[in-house]
C-alpha cells in the first residue's frame, strides 16, 4: 500500500495520490502559519488561537487501492484570510455556482455571459476607496437600459492581485505578452506595475436568449464600464459567452480566492493593505435569478442536479501537523457506521485544481 512505501523515489511522488494530497495541504498549512503572524494585531486571542490550530489534524478517506483521497473532517478556523479555509471554500463554491448555472440554464432557459471588469493598477492606500467606487459603478452600469432589459441576475466576485515581481519574468511575459509588446518591454525589464494592486470583478451574468439585435459586444461592454467608472483609460475587460455548462473554467474563475495567499502574504505591509481593504466586505454577490436559486440550493431542492460520488471509500487516514510537516497518525478501516454514512453520497465540492 502507498502509505507504507516510504522509500518511493522523488520522481514518483507526484504520481502518488497520498503524497500529492499531503503536499497540497502542507503548502496551505505553511501559509496558514505565516498568516498567523501577520494577522495577530487585528484579531482577538481566541480567533488567533483558532487560526493557529486550523488543520492541525486532518482526516482523509480513500478507496481500497488508495487512488483517490478525499478530505473527510478536520478543525477549520473559517477565517476568510486563512489559506486553508479559502481553498476549501473555493471548491465548495465551485460546486454551488455550477449547480445554480445548471438549474438556471435548464429550468429558466437563460444563457450566460462571463465578464471580467478591471481598473488600472493602484497603490495600497487607494484600495478601499477604489473598491467602493467599483461597487457603485457596477450598480450604475447594470441600470443602463440595454443591460437591464437583457439581464436576469448575476454573480459578482471581487478579486485583488498584487504585482510582487520587480522585473519582467518569462512567465509574466508569456501571460501579458500583448501588454509588454505594446510598450516595447522585454524579459528582464522593470515591471511598470511593481508594488501595485489590481482589484477587478469576475461576473457571471444570466441573460435572455441573445441574438444579433440584443447582444452586447465587448467594445460596448468596455464603453459602458468606462462611462460608469468615469475613466476612459480602462482598456482591459474580458467578455465571453459561456456555451456549455459542463465547461467549468469560468465557474472556477468566479469561485476562486478573492486574494491569493502568494500575494497577500508577501510581507506584513502588503498583508495590511489586503486586510483593511477586504475586512467586512461582501466578496461574492448573488442577484436576481442567482439569488433566488441560491435559496433553493440551501434548502436542498437542487440536490437532484448533483452527482453521486461513485468512489467506494474503505479507509480513514489521519495526519497530524508536527513542527514543519504532516505525519501519518492513523490508518484504519472505516467502521460499519462510517462506511454507510460516507459512501453513495452526493458530492459536496468540485474535484478541481484552482490556481494558487
Which residue ranges define each predicted feature?
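Right-hand nucleic-acid polymerase module
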Residues: 1-197, 207-356
